[in-house]
């Protein structure tokens, strides 16, 4: 919506809807929606490539625990698909805005090995830095921190923690927390995240931006804000116990 409201650009959305929902579509003649995988981007956008100014690549597999259960899907999206996106932008001199994750930079970078998700995202950052050195590739990197707000996924295996709490609250059932519950997270509203992405794109500085609230909250603290009963679940693989925030 920021781009629609503040620019004259037309927008093409490429999504395989593995987690996306068509109910979130914006009704506008300036927006074209295409259902496909990012690994097909060169073929799908062949007719448009000369007219594309910038590409916002936010469509990757983006869950830690689920990446253990669906590792092939994670690699297919984050490694194979993203490589095609990078190559498409590089070949056609298109500016890239890429969403990174705090999961890959925690514990002085060691957390990148905690899960297939964090690992693939970390490797993408290494690749981008090399593409910059090798080919002077232009891009902005935006680090997302537990984004929540309208349109968040509330149900299914890819639901967000706030989305899960919201759904359970509406159903008047106990809020489920993965033990120990003291895991701390920095949460960022979707509107603030979008504003930061727009800022980075407009500034065009080829920089890394870390978008986060200054304060961290434990999962238990967040759950208690709903004034609901709490049910604890067994610990999960790849769980991080603190959000990461570094100087960018």
Predicted regions and their residues:
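Short, surface-exposed alpha-helical segments at coil->helix boundaries
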Residues: 22-23, 125, 163, 216, ...
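Glycine-rich "substrate-gating" loop/helix at the edge of Rossmann-like oxidoreductase active sites
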Residues: 114-117, 145-159, 179-190, 239
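N-terminal Rossmann-like NAD(P)+-binding domain of SDR-like oxidoreductases, especially those catalyzing
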Residues: 1-147, 191
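Short beta-loop-alpha junction of Rossmann-like oxidoreductase domains
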Residues: 108, 150-153, 220
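CheY-like receiver
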Residues: 44-47, 88, 168, 196, ...
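Activation loop
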Residues: 63, 101, 124, 157, ...
